[in-house]
Amino acid sequence: MWNEAVPLTAEDIEEYKKKTYLGYQPTPYELYIKVLIDTFGDQVEDDFSIQLPDGVKDLKYQKDAVIQGYQMLMQHNGLFLADVVGLGKTIIATMIAKRFVEANGKNTNILVVYPPALEDNWRNTFKLFGIYKKAQFITNGSLSKVLDGKDNYKDKEEFDLIIVDEAHGFRSDSSGKYDELQKICKSPCINMGLLKSSQKKVMLLSATPLNNRPDDLQNQLLLFQNSQSCTIDGVPNLKGLFSEHILDYKRLMRERDQRDVTSEVDKIYEQIRSKVIDKVTVRRTRNNILNDPDYRADIKSQGIIFPNILPPNELEYVMDSDTSNRFYETLKQLTDGKTDENPEGKGLTYARYRAVEFLKPEYRNKYKNAVHIGQTLAAIYRVHMVKRLESSFYAFKKSLRTLLRITTDMIKMFKEDKVIIAPDLKVKELQAKNMELDEIIEYAITKGYAAEDILFPADAFTSEFLEMLHHDREILEQLNADWEKENDDPKFDKFQENLTHNFFDKEINPSGKLVLFSESVDTLNYLYDRLTKEIGRSDVLMVTAANRNRLEQTIKENFDANFDSDSMRYNIIITSDVLAEGVNLHRSNVIVNYDSPWNATRLMQRIGRVNRIGSVAPNIYNYMFYPSQQGDKEIQLYKNALVKLQGFHSAFGEDAQIYSKEEIVKELQMFDNNVKDSIDKKIALLREVRELYNSDRKLYHKIKALPMKSRVMRDTGKHSGKSIIFVSSNVKTEFYLATTTGVEVIDFLEAVKYLKAKPEEQPVPFSNEEQHYKHVNSALAQYTTEYVEAADTSSINRTDLDKTSLEANKFLRTIKQITADSELKLQCDVLMGYINEGIYAQLPRYLKALSREYKNDRAKMKQDEYSLQNKISELLGEYQTMNKEQRHDAQDISNPQIIISESFK
């Protein structure tokens, strides 16, 4: 060996040093630009171009969204595409999909998931961009067809990219459709394309991904992230990060009746936004686009207008004293029922919906959580009745008559000693058709029901239940009689007044088009009759779920500004929320919300129908019929919606008032008056490094090629004794701030505040190298502790898991102990790995429920070993994901590197 050795000279050593961080001293500016290059990656040099189909505008902000989104897709296996309503999410998603197909190869398969109303939009857009044959399309309620192999759908493992439109519909991880989607998203890819990835990519589209709670965001993130092996910078444990925010949010929701909690809800969502959302979300508001000079010039040159959404206009109606008294007394009866919390209540109990709650114990056993089910149904119906009262007196009277009828029918069942409980059978509807009870029972048996499962004698219920039914009937008869005397409708009078003098004023409504939304179809029928028959308007179009598809062409001709036709056949469209998504109504710039939706994000979606690319009016007017003071007192509709909407604004940086004049849109100030929020700041930083790339390519490539561990010492007169360290692996990057007291993770924008430097600034000699190395090593040690060790599922701290996961794991370990079957033991190990990594939401819940059947009875488990083996095997088939080696390769963070470090004198 020594005979083959080559002698090294001092010159050789110096030459080798030049190739390492020891051989070249970068300037602070060069290190700053190096961080921008590494952070923005392909976004800087990306020369992405696509042949746009005829009729599709070439918009710079959309192309940049494609570049950013594709990079997130590659880095995190998924993203939120959450540009505000009307900025072209479908087009952007399709361009990302086309780019993915080009990168991954001809065998790429895409699954597009959407609400039924959006099917044509997706199919047509994919055809337009030439990737229709690469995709299969499915409505969001039909995902079981993929899992069951029906209707010629490919196996879930054959899809490489999943696109989910209106993804906020999958916010609840306890729903069946969420479980189905998660199984599809987390299953491995068997077609190893050119990208050589066995992990699916997932695009979640929604202008409103936050619906009500922090849980909603967490659940959607878990469609493409695992809780324990999260790829998002600064998040070692996704559920761990969210759990504190979820608890705080629940506490604030309990306290909101007593005090204003809006600012505290803001803080929760601001933290979620900065720690998580910004890193996996492509989201631009209209303000973000207008704040960027390149984007602003681009849309101006193409004649695109972004209308101003003006503050909501309140339409308050005044009731006379007789109507007001009737209204208030009715609310009292609707909401003041006797409950455990309100034992003195004398109002409606909604007993008709609480039958299972009052079964005697020996009959109630077949219903799990019977008391909870009954009380929940009663609460839902109470809210429903108050909402109907707020919507229109007509709708409320109709619901009042229905509730009286079904309550009377239940009393009739008691008299005949034949009480039927079968929710799926729709007994109330059959009774409404005058079917006798014996006929209903015979009908149920033909449908596969056993008589003993649905038919109960009167004495199967506690005596209290029949008393409650009689109590409710008495109140309902009085209310019905009282409301039959009410012939006034001050709300409609207010609407008609504005229809005559305001809504069609050319100063505010140049196109002469009006859009009205109501949650209640009964209210729409009432309005349509009065508008057409009483007022005599022939230009009113009513759209509901029943006729939406049939009227699609008519809607486009009369209300879509992008459509060739400018028909004036219909100038008023009154509709339910069936048109709140996936349709253009932007020939209009005036929206009337006849009632306020319980789901506050619907308000954003409604306004989004008229605030779209192609809008021609300079302003958008948003009229609201607010709940009366009495209604607000009882159900706090206004306050609930405000809290939820403000939470959404804080998390996503919305750009307009939606609900009330009190609502303040967050202008999230960063560094100067021209930059409004973190998205603006990142766009500005990307523009800065792109300008260097375009103006001085030689310097750009020199900086890009700086070696790992490049370092600099600065003397700026501030930050004395601090260091910034940038650590990265194949999966995750982190910025650390190190001081004499320790190290802490900071986000990219915070790091940039320290690193930003001008080209002329020069470095200073290292005055304390020992401290610098200590800072660097401390940062590397923290990264290793938080990510490298945590990524080893065998070393996961059991306290990181929730109680359900711990119980599921305990059950699986017990199965391993009672069986000698090596295959069953291996299957249990695989499932425990899934649970430890937080891959599936419903898997631990299912195992927990299964464990409750055995109550830790090992003898019974041993006796049922064959059955348990089948169930465990079925679970593995259902909850299938990449094997351990594939997951390790996809999430390998075992070799972290120091990219740069910077210390301050």
Mark where each language-model region is.
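ATP-dependent helicase/translocase motor core
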Residues: 1-84, 91-103, 107, 175-182, ...
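C-terminal accessory region of SF2 helicases/translocases
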Residues: 2, 21-28, 40, 615-905
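Conserved Helicase C-terminal RecA-like lobe
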Residues: 47-51, 55, 97, 299-319, ...
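Conserved Walker A/P-loop ATP-binding site and its immediately adjacent core
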Residues: 90-95, 106-128, 211-215, 519-524
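Conserved helicase motor
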Residues: 117, 138-147, 174, 518-522, ...
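Conserved helix-turn-beta segment of the N-terminal RecA-like "Helicase ATP-binding" lobe
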Residues: 117-136, 224-228, 530-538
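Inter-lobe coupling linker of SF2 helicases/translocases
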Residues: 137-170, 174-200, 204-207, 216, ...
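Conserved RecA-like P-loop NTPase helicase motor core
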Residues: 171, 208, 532, 536-634
